[in-house]
Amino acid sequence: MQGIGFYIKNKTMDYKKLKFETRQIHAGLNAQEPTGSRGVAIYPTSAYRFKDCEYAANLFELSEAGNIYTRLQNPTTTNYEERIAALYGGVAAVATSSGMSAIVTALTCLASEGENIVASPLLYGGTYNLFRCTLRRLGIEIRIAPTTDPADFARLIDDKTRAVYAESMGNPTCEVPDIEKLGEIAHKAGVPLVIDNTFGAAGYLCNPFDWGADIIVDSATKWINGHGTAMGGIIVDGGTFDWGNGKFPNIDGPSEGYHGLNLYKAFGNMAFAVKCRVDGLRDLGTCPSPFDAYLMMIGLETLSLRVRHEVESTRRLAEYLRDHKAVKTVSYVGFEEHPSHKNAAKYFRFDGCGPVLNVELVGDVDTTAKFVESLELAAHMTMIGDSITVVTHPASTTHKQLSEADMAKAGVTPTLLRISPGLENIEDIIADFEQAFAKALK
């Protein structure tokens, strides 16, 4: 195994023995840090001095550990990546500049021109446009399954398929796919299952690795940061996929950029993470700022506390809205009648009571707009997982670029509202909704 050293390093304890709440604080801290600092240091540097020419050459051929350039790695970011990998139980993590950059980096390291990825129909609008526009221009075909039934995914897979892709909880519909069955289908075809686990809150609510996923992408901007103060994404390599099955010569084959180096033979079960870093970050430049990595580290220390509060607030808000005369429908996976409740209860903590819900109001689009514009406490933004309550109108924001037909496939209606409760007292959130309803229904 080559000596690349910017993955999980400086371990002073076995994280697998620790509970999530302990790992979110201790993982990624270097007990041997020479200053004795309790916190992680921020390294605002673009480059690093090489001790001699031989050392520099070794770094660039990936035969020795060390820092090269912050586009590839940074000590602050390395600490953050180690914490994320420990929370998920992955072999390595690669931080990126946004959730979208995590997706595009991961998928372009899996598929090439003329190959395809089979994906869920229930996707975040930005992801849908990435699939429909940018990846298509790169020659990568995205085959959207007609439903989330695993059998529909299976029918689209052929010898050119290089991954199966889904969200652990669809955005914005909150539908939960059968992750375990999708994993079985992907593995039968010899390809990895990639799960966007943004709604799974860094593995606290849902850890797809426990159910057969091979690669996880996550928008760290949401629950990982938790305060709307930083952008970031993350790719986590579960270390379980067999890259030597003949379908991935870009990983188990000679690397054009590294004089024929075979990443799988050199790096073993973390080969995909290495690929994302030394090819993906190098060529696409999707690296995060060390300042943002630091803010993600701070956010992670309170993640379980925040998410537990937000899940409970979501439950109480859903119960309030279900009985309100101004509300036509409430889509909340915590309700037994929700079509995804069974899957949510299987894959998510707290009996599947997720951190987001959707509602449709009585009336038309104008009524919906009036309600949103009348909110005083909740913010009208394209955000979830923030410390403040966020209400989003997907049809005019996150899914605006989609056609009406594509919106319908994604579960987005003209009057749908996505609600992500924050850390405020739930009684204040409900009071804000009540006064907005009164104004909207005048």
Q: How would you label these PLM feature ranges?
A:
Residues 14-74, 82-83:
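N-terminal "arm"/small-domain region of PLP-dependent enzymes with the aminotransferase-like
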Residues 65, 91, 292, 296, ...:
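Short amphipathic alpha-helical segments
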Residues 15, 24-33, 93-323:
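Conserved PLP-enzyme active-site core in the AAT-like
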Residues 52-104, 126-134:
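Conserved N-terminal alpha-helix of the aminotransferase class I/II PLP-enzyme fold
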Residues 3-11, 114, 132-133, 141-143, ...:
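PLP-dependent enzyme catalytic core of the Aspartate aminotransferase-like
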